[in-house]
A protein has these predicted regions:
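Conserved dinucleotide-binding and phosphotransfer motif residues
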Residues: 49
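Feature responds to low-complexity, polar/acidic, surface-exposed segments characteristic
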Residues: 2-40, 52-102, 110-131, 136-177, ...
Length: 199
C-alpha cells in the first residue's frame, strides 16, 4: 500500500506541475476533443502523464467511447506506475485477453480490482462510475477491509466517493457506461483528492 501511495504522490506532483504549464484548452491536440469539452483539462493531464493516450491509427482520443473493465485496469496500472510486465501470471481470470493479463494481474495483486466471483473479470463489460470509483478509491487507501463495505459495495462507494469528490462532474450512476472522457475526469478527481493515511 505504501508503494501505491508513493506512486500516486509522484503522479499528483506531476499533475500539479503540469497544471502550472498548461497554456490553454485543446493543447492535447486531439482533433476530436473540442476546446469546450467538459473533460478537456483532464484529458490533457492524463495524456501528459502518459496514463491515457489517443488512438495511434486515427490520432483521436475518442472521448465519448465506452471503457471496458479491461481498459480501466490499464488506466489504473498506468496511473499507479505499476511494473505490470511481471504480473501476467498473477491474473486469475480466464476471460482476460492475453495482451491485458499483465495489467489486470498487477491491479489484482495490488488489490485494485476484483472479479465477479465465478472466475471471470468481466473483461469486455463496460465499466460503471461506481466500479471505476471503487478502483480509484482502493488505490487511494480506502476500502481495505471487508467491514468498509458493511452497507453494500455501491452504497459505500457512492457515499465515500461523493465525500472526497471522485464523482465531481461525472455522476455516480451504478448502471451507466463510463466514457473515456469521464474516466480521465475521474482519474484527475482522484489525483486531486485526499489519500487515506494510517497511523
Amino acid at each position: 500500500m505504501r508503494n501505491l501511495k508513493r506512486a500516486l504522490s509522484l503522479t499528483l506532483a506531476s499533475v500539479m506541475l503540469l497544471g502550472m504549464m498548461v497554456v490553454g484548452a485543446g493543447a492535447a491536440g486531439f482533433p476530436d476533443v473540442a476546446d469546450d469539452n467538459d473533460n478537456v483539462e483532464a484529458i490533457e493531464v492524463l495524456q501528459a502523464i502518459e496514463v491515457m493516450v489517443g488512438n495511434a491509427d486515427t490520432g483521436n482520443f475518442e472521448p465519448d467511447r465506452s471503457v471496458t473493465r479491461t481498459e480501466m485496469a490499464v488506466v489504473m496500472a498506468n496511473l499507479l506506475k505499476l511494473d505490470y510486465k511481471y504480473y501476467e501470471a498473477s491474473c486469475p481470470f480466464w476471460d482476460v485477453p492475453t495482451w491485458a493479463r499483465p495489467y489486470v494481474g498487477a491491479c489484482y495483486a495490488n488489490k485494485i480490482v476484483s472479479g465477479y466471483g465465478d472466475g471471470t473479470y468481466g473483461a469486455l463489460d463496460p465499466i460503471t462510475p461506481v466500479q471505476a470509483a471503487s478502483m480509484m478509491m482502493r488505490a487511494l487507501g480506502y476500502f481495505q477491509y471487508s467491514e468498509d463495505y458493511k452497507d453494500g459495495f455501491e452504497t459505500a462507494t457512492v457515499r465515500q466517493g461523493t465525500q472526497i469528490g471522485i464523482f465531481e462532474g461525472i455522476g455516480s450512476s451504478a448502471d451507466k457506461d463510463m466514457t473515456r472522457g469521464q474516466v480521465a475526469r475521474m482519474a484527475l478527481n482522484a489525483l486531486e483528492s485526499e489519500m487515506v493515511t494510517f497511523t
